[in-house]
A protein has these predicted regions:
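Hard-cation-handling environments
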Residues: 241, 250-261
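Single conserved hydrophobic/aromatic residue that forms the stacking wall/gate
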Residues: 259-270
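Active-site metal-binding motif and surrounding structural segment of the metallo-beta-lactamase
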Residues: 38-54
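Metal-associated gating/positioning segment near the N- to mid-region
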Residues: 52-117
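Short catalytic-loop micro-motif centered on adjacent basic/acidic residues
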Residues: 93, 123-126, 234-239
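Histidine/acidic-residue-rich, glycine-tolerant segments that coordinate divalent metal ions
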Residues: 97-108, 112-227, 244
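N-terminal metal-binding scaffold of metallo-dependent hydrolase/deaminase domains
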Residues: 1-41
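Histidine-centered divalent metal-coordination motifs
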Residues: 62-66, 180, 239
Length: 270
């Protein structure tokens, strides 16, 4: 059993920043020490981290590595190398690749591929569709991190828009549901409205806030929250983008605070 002492570091952890050291026993942190306190037991190796920050391994629970099928952009080998270099030691990958991770076979193949390519810890979301709800109860919940649910259309065309399918997903998933929430009916209506007024060709990006509007976001998010309350499902709503939606979570934990705050005003300036 090898013990390594990393000392003279600036430790960043749980909202605190302090000078100190860490003792690692094989691959497990066994002591976190403040100031010049020395380890309780002598160590086999020492690393002077003067001038460096020392943080726990970061867990990124929402990545798109585009593997399989879109590996001209990136793959699990390249992205986990970048992750490790930046201190990210675990990731959870989304299912809108090619083929989509919407069957048990595709999910198993992705785990097998990751075992050969990944140099950090990994898990994968299973993609829900209108037609695969019968597979949810067959998922290995010790290894699958959650079910990705597109309640609005996005990359990969995995929209789930049948209320009976949504109810079944919320009642039978048995693991975390990570939902992309935009009401597709409102989006279609807004798209046609913009096209009728400004023309069919290449709708300008400036119309994005009108098409994927506050109402579209709120309507879908409120439905997701309602279904979660009715079924007791564990729900995460991803990339919330409106103040109105935040009202749905006033008494709920927020695990990722706002990290970017552009508005339609900023789009006009860009």
């Amino acid at each position: 059993m090898k013990r390594t002492w990393i000392y003279n570091a600036t430790i960043v952890n749980e909202g605190l920043k302090f000078a100190g050291s860490v003792v690692v026993e094989d691959d497990t942190i066994c002591e976190v020490l403040q100031g010049e306190v020395r380890p309780s037991v002598p160590c086999d190796a020492e690393i002077d981290a003067r001038g460096c920050y020392l943080i726990p391994g970061v867990i990124d629970d929402h990545v798109h590595f585009r593997d399989p099928g879109l590996t001209h952009k990136a793959d699990m080998a390249s992205e986990t190398a970048a992750a490790a270099a930046g201190g990210v030691t675990s990731f959870m990958d989304m299912p809108n690749c090619n083929p989509q991770t919407t069957t048990l076979e595709a999910l198993e193949n992705k785990f097998a591929d990751a075992a050969n390519k990944c140099i950090v810890n990994y898990s994968f979301y299973f993609g829900a569709t209108n037609n695969n709800t019968e597979l949810l109860q067959q998922l290995d919940k010790k290894h699958v991190c959650g079910v990705k649910l597109f309640m609005g259309a996005s990359t990969g065309n995995m929209l789930v828009d049948r209320i009976e399918s949504l109810r079944k997903i919320f009642s039978e998933a048995g693991i975390l549901i990570a939902a992309h929430c935009e009401d597709q009916t409102i989006i279609r209506w807004n798209t046609e409205l913009v096209k009728s007024k400004y023309g069919e060709e290449d709708v300008d990006i400036l119309f994005h806030p009108r098409i994927r509007s506050e109402e579209a976001c709120w309507r879908s998010s409120s439905l997701a929250v309602q279904l979660a309350k009715e079924t007791g499902a564990r729900l995460h709503i991803l990339h919330v983008s409106t103040a109105r939606e935040l009202e749905l979570f006033e008494d709920k934990p927020i695990s990722c605070l706002l990290y970017t705050s552009p508005s339609p005003r900023d789009m006009r300036r860009s």
